[in-house]
Swiss-Prot record:
Coiled-coil intervals: none
Location of the protein in the cell: Cytoplasm
Natural source organism: Pseudomonas putida (strain W619)
A Gene Ontology BP annotation from the UniProt entry: L-histidine biosynthetic process
HAMAP family named in the record: HisE
Protein's UniProt name: Phosphoribosyl-ATP pyrophosphatase
GO molecular function: ATP binding; phosphoribosyl-ATP diphosphatase activity
CDD domains in UniProt: NTP-PPase_HisIE_like
Length: 111
């Protein structure tokens, strides 16, 4: 796993025990999963808007910035649910080389 992701996962776990007024992440954990999901939704919309703007302007700095926010808040959500980022990387690895159509068919119940 990326060293950056691993370090971030460690910090996120540490923030679970921190006082809510000590950090942004600690305050999110204190407010609960619904607040974390609300933030994740906001970041999703901001990323979509930045991508639409980048497609026209060809300036990708905002879409990179917003994607980083989206990934960050996704990691906060996973941590709040007791999941490590490695689980997502493992799932991506599992899918590597697998046709998207085949993967989708494997998830669908047979008729």
């Amino acid at each position: 796993m990326s060293d950056t992701l691993n370090r971030l996962a460690e910090v996120l776990e540490e923030r679970k025990q921190a006082a809510p007024d000590s950090s942004y992440v600690a305050s999110l954990y204190h407010k609960g999963l619904n607040k974390i999901l609300e933030k994740l939704g906001e970041e999703s919309v901001e990323t979509i808007i930045a991508a639409k703007d980048a497609a026209v302007s060809k300036d990708y700095s905002d879409v990179i910035y917003e994607t980083a926010d989206l990934w960050f808040h996704s990691l906060v959500m996973l941590s709040a649910l007791g999941q490590h980022p490695q689980a997502v990387l493992d799932e991506l690895e599992r899918r590597f080389g697998l046709s998207g159509h085949d993967e989708k068919a494997a998830r669908e119940p047979s008729a």
